[in-house]
């Protein structure tokens, strides 16, 4: 349990530090009124708050009021659609497509919670439905978004591809980890699953922020050309 407290605490620290750095970046070099700038620190702050609560639960300070798993999925159902919406905005897709992508994301997480909270055949039905929603989301990322962003500048396309590829790779590992975990085949035990999920969360979210900060030229191009006039 002490190890889990360290993992959750380290994750929370990484999320909050990345949020603060990005807010500073937005205040000094960007436009905090643009969704391009205010969404990234929101999504890592949500994750940071969830990880603080997880650390407190693991340490016994919050008792059994809520489970770590419930907190984790509550974080994901808020923070992951922000990433999806962000990628959709960056790609410049229309409003209907953005809503479809966000809806698929919410279904993926919401039904995925059924996998960890139900039992028997219902658990595997939930896993299958969540996986189908994820595959649909991947199609939007890889095909629909990619077709639309072909009209953007080379720097914006490169930025989108980096963020999308990071998201696709990390998110694809979550169902594998859960399938191999205690609720699936049992190859991965609960403490190891919690560690792996914490690592994936950190890579997915802090990595997303890091790419944005490093790729400042691409960010600047995007803000100048698209963020002031959102796609309709």
Curated annotation (Swiss-Prot):
<feature type="site" description="Primary proton acceptor">
    <location>
        <position position="75"/>
    </location>
</feature>
<feature type="transmembrane region" description="Helical">
    <location>
        <begin position="194"/>
        <end position="214"/>
    </location>
</feature>
<keyword id="KW-0716">Sensory transduction</keyword>
<feature type="transmembrane region" description="Helical">
    <location>
        <begin position="73"/>
        <end position="93"/>
    </location>
</feature>
<dbReference type="GO" id="GO:0016020">
    <property type="term" value="C:membrane"/>
</dbReference>
<comment type="function">
    <text>Sensory rhodopsin. Associates with an unusual transducer lacking a methyl-accepting transducer domain found in all other photosensory transducers. The chromophore is all-trans-retinal in the dark.</text>
</comment>
<keyword id="KW-1133">Transmembrane helix</keyword>
<feature type="modified residue" description="N6-(retinylidene)lysine">
    <location>
        <position position="205"/>
    </location>
</feature>
<feature type="transmembrane region" description="Helical">
    <location>
        <begin position="100"/>
        <end position="120"/>
    </location>
</feature>
<keyword id="KW-0812">Transmembrane</keyword>
<protein>
    <recommendedName>
        <fullName>Sensory rhodopsin III</fullName>
    </recommendedName>
</protein>
<feature type="transmembrane region" description="Helical">
    <location>
        <begin position="39"/>
        <end position="59"/>
    </location>
</feature>
<comment type="subunit">
    <text>Interacts with HtrM.</text>
</comment>
<feature type="transmembrane region" description="Helical">
    <location>
        <begin position="5"/>
        <end position="25"/>
    </location>
</feature>
<dbReference type="GO" id="GO:0009881">
    <property type="term" value="F:photoreceptor activity"/>
</dbReference>
<keyword id="KW-0675">Receptor</keyword>
<feature type="transmembrane region" description="Helical">
    <location>
        <begin position="125"/>
        <end position="145"/>
    </location>
</feature>
<keyword id="KW-0600">Photoreceptor protein</keyword>
<dbReference type="GO" id="GO:0007602">
    <property type="term" value="P:phototransduction"/>
</dbReference>
<keyword id="KW-0157">Chromophore</keyword>
<comment type="similarity">
    <text>Belongs to the archaeal/bacterial/fungal opsin family.</text>
</comment>
<dbReference type="InterPro" id="IPR001425">
    <property type="entry name" value="Arc/bac/fun_rhodopsins"/>
</dbReference>
<keyword id="KW-0472">Membrane</keyword>
<keyword id="KW-0681">Retinal protein</keyword>
<dbReference type="Pfam" id="PF01036">
    <property type="entry name" value="Bac_rhodopsin"/>
</dbReference>
<feature type="transmembrane region" description="Helical">
    <location>
        <begin position="168"/>
        <end position="188"/>
    </location>
</feature>
